[in-house]
A protein has these predicted regions:
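Accessory RNA-recognition modules of RNA-modification enzymes
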Residues: 1-248
């Protein structure tokens, strides 16, 4: 946080030519593990190998992996066994889907370089209300195998309140222009903040650290010193959390 603050101050003073007499310290998040409410994982048939693994000479029969992209290597992912960023339910869902695809015929992990495969990406959203959203993205339609996988997920994790899927045959992984279909449950989850309830869908922008967003909004509202007679514009809004929050 110290170096992040230094960078911000440098950008404002050296580049922006803004004179600043005092800069308050960054208020760090109390929680540094399991704090995210949204994660996206990529299925790849080319998992990243460490330098030690490459030098070992060991033969890796299965190169399938589910995890995050390696910087500078668009077609490789870091195969994650335990992610410390989101509630543990996220780990259990990801590993269950991975295991199902590896042990059942017809679920090849996506080849990003050659644009081949079936199972592509996975999005998991959690909420403080207990709602849970899972979105599975496939490269092409295979109704029998798609329904088999989604039914398995629904049966194994009844706590999922929104189970959805996407057929994305494009070269890139973005789903903002894709139709998202509901397999079971609702098309959204509900997040709550200070009595306000927000509908969050697969394409919604909502601060990924709910607890820290609440702290941020409280401080911003305090700094604004609103009396109730002002007109506030939320010019770069996502889900509308800030506008609704300060309106109280």
């Amino acid at each position: 946080l110290k170096y992040k603050q230094k960078q911000v101050i440098d950008n404002l003073t050296r580049i922006g030519k803004i004179q600043m007499e005092e800069v308050l310290p960054i208020l760090g998040s109390e929680h540094t593990q399991f704090y995210r409410n949204k994660l996206e994982f990529t299925f790849s048939n080319k998992k990243w190998l460490t330098e030690e693994q490459v030098q070992s000479g060991e033969s890796f029969d299965c190169m399938n992996g589910v995890g995050f992209h390696i910087p500078g290597m668009f077609d490789k992912v870091l195969d994650i066994h335990k992610c410390w960023l989101q509630d543990d339910i996220s780990n259990r869902i990801r590993l269950a889907i991975k295991d199902y695809c590896l042990t059942h015929e017809g679920y090849p992990f996506f080849d990003l370089r050659n644009q081949e495969g079936f199972i592509r990406t996975l999005m998991i959203r959690t909420a403080s209300t207990g709602d849970l959203m899972v979105v599975v993205v496939f490269f092409h339609e295979d109704k029998e195998r798609r329904e088999a996988l989604l039914s398995y997920v629904a049966e194994q994790f009844p706590e999922i309140t929104s189970l959805q899927y996407v057929i994305n045959g494009k070269c890139n992984d973005t789903i903002t222009d894709q139709e998202i279909l509901v397999y079971k449950g609702k098309d959204h989850i509900i997040e709550e903040m200070e009595g306000l309830k927000f509908k969050v869908g697969p394409k919604s922008f909502y601060q990924t650290n709910s607890a820290q967003a609440y702290n941020l909004y409280k401080i911003a509202r305090s700094f604004a010193q609103l009396t109730g007679n002002e007109l506030v514009y939320d010019l770069y809004t996502g889900t509308g959390t800030i506008a609704n929050f300060v309106s109280r």
